[in-house]
Every structure is written in C-alpha cells, then in structure tokens.
Amino acid sequence: MAKVLVLLKVLPEDINIDLEELKEKIRKALPEGYEIKGYDIEPIAFGLKALRLYIFMPEETEGGTEPLENTVMNVEGVSQVEVEAVHRIT
C-alpha cells in the first residue's frame, strides 16, 4: 500500500512557544502509521514563525487529511493548521 506525504503548516499560539518542543508534542500525538519525516521553520512576520511538517500517513485513511489536522489542532500550543500539499508516494 502506498503512503501519502502531507506538508502541514502549523502556527503556534504565541511567538514564545519553542517550535522544537511543539514538534515533539505533535510527534507524540500522532496515531500509529503516521510519521514526521522532516520539518522546517518559516518566518511569518513580527517574530512569528510557522512549523512546516512533512508527515507520512496511510493512503487509505478515511476522511483524508482531516483526522491528521484534528489531531495536530488538539496539541497544546497549536493555534492554526493548514495543509499546503498532499503527494502520493509509491
């Protein structure tokens, strides 16, 4: 079965949130079969930075990326989640 690579942009609640710690909280919250394969940090404005996560998830997930988005939104310190791209990986 193929996997799906999702590029997820995560905005923190506050500019003082440590994005490395936030990434680890998200990693721990992900369900089985989901895996952070990489990340980068994107400056937004006025000191605010976004965490861009590259996440592998199962292809046959009911609801598409919605369960992933909901899981990440429920992590403490996350203000907003946006799917930037979705790619099927064979």
Swiss-Prot record:
Q: Which InterPro entries match?
A: eEF-1beta-like_sf, EF1B_bsu/dsu_GNE, Transl_elong_EF1B/ribsomal_bS6, Transl_elong_EF1B_B_arc
GO MF terms, alphabetically ordered: translation elongation factor activity
Is Protein biosynthesis one of the keywords?
A: yes
Name which cysteines form disulfide bonds: none
Q: Does the keyword Protein biosynthesis apply?
A: yes
Give the UniProt keywords, A-Z: Elongation factor, Protein biosynthesis
Biological role stated in the UniProt entry: Promotes the exchange of GDP for GTP in EF-1-alpha/GDP, thus allowing the regeneration of EF-1-alpha/GTP that could then be used to form the ternary complex EF-1-alpha/GTP/AAtRNA.
Q: Which family does it belong to?
A: Belongs to the EF-1-beta/EF-1-delta family.
Protein name, please? Answer: Elongation factor 1-beta
